[in-house]
Amino acid sequence: MGIKPSYIKSMGIALLEQHGKSFNGNFDDNKKVVAEITTIESKMIRNRVAGYVTRKVNTTPARR
């Protein structure tokens, strides 16, 4: 889907550092967690952050 904007990456990394145990490799589960943890009003931004977090969880060997 292309390169993510820096604000998506920084928000995703911050969420993983603070609430890493809450996330898993499932996008739908991560959407709900991002909605609960953050105050992001935009559905599109929330989904992009959840997608970035899901991708990080699935591709980072230590998180598997």
UniProtKB/Swiss-Prot annotation:
GO terms for biological process: translation. It holds the Pfam family Ribosomal_S17e. GO terms for molecular function: structural constituent of ribosome. One of its GO terms (cellular component) is ribosome. The keyword Ribonucleoprotein applies. InterPro entries: Ribosomal_eS17 (IPR001210), Ribosomal_eS17_CS (IPR018273), Ribosomal_eS17_sf (IPR036401). It comes from the Archaea. The keyword Ribosomal protein applies. Belongs to the eukaryotic ribosomal protein eS17 family. This is Small ribosomal subunit protein eS17. It comes from Methanocorpusculum labreanum (strain ATCC 43576 / DSM 4855 / Z). The lineage of its organism: Archaea, Methanobacteriati, Methanobacteriota, Stenosarchaea group, Methanomicrobia.
